[in-house]
């Protein structure tokens, strides 16, 4: 199974434990892109709505495309009652949007699953002149606030983390947008924090793509090791989060 499809196997766990984003990030994004009633927005791969509520509640014409069938159904059950909510179950790479164009296209930890050339050329074509492309992600630091626990967790990874296929972190070039016609590229950062118990940390760790598919006999030993490490540290692990927002704009007069 492709890594980008494995999240669909854990919709409830994904919904509960994947990180949300800071209110400040959304305030800036909504203001920068001018999102509100009368504006059309497309979210790429919303998952179960980790970045959906603040945009949907602006009253914009909200659209989403979700690859996973179970994630799609979860989104429909959560937001189907909103009159401005529309979602399709499909693959952005191949989906035909027809003549529809958007004032903003945004992604919360999704666009990196799309080949760069397709990601930027297709979003560029789908945006109206002056439209905004927004890409957000979370970087969690659990080393700084839990140094001893961090070292213990690294021992667990060294002993038992044996995925059948490695996930290549950081391969997507967000600043590559400027190579495909986008202008005014910028990066903004916002601070946040999460605190997990041992059970919560194990459940959260189980939402990472390469952790979802971790095979036995390593899988049980790995997650048991994570659980015990946090229990021995007082049943508490802290993540100092950085929410990253990349913004780019389609020129009013595209070349």
Predicted regions: what they are:
Residues 40-42, 48-95:
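Class I SAM-dependent methyltransferase SAM/SAH-binding core
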Residues 109-110:
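Short catalytic micro-motifs in class I SAM-dependent methyltransferases
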Residues 113-123:
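A short, conserved alpha-helix within the catalytic core of class I
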Residues 1-36:
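Conserved class I S-adenosyl-L-methionine
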Residues 48, 165-166, 170-255:
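Conserved Class I S-adenosyl-L-methionine
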Residues 124, 128-192:
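Conserved catalytic/acceptor-binding region of the Class I
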Residues 95-105:
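A short acidic, Gly/Pro-enriched loop at the edge of an enzyme's catalytic core
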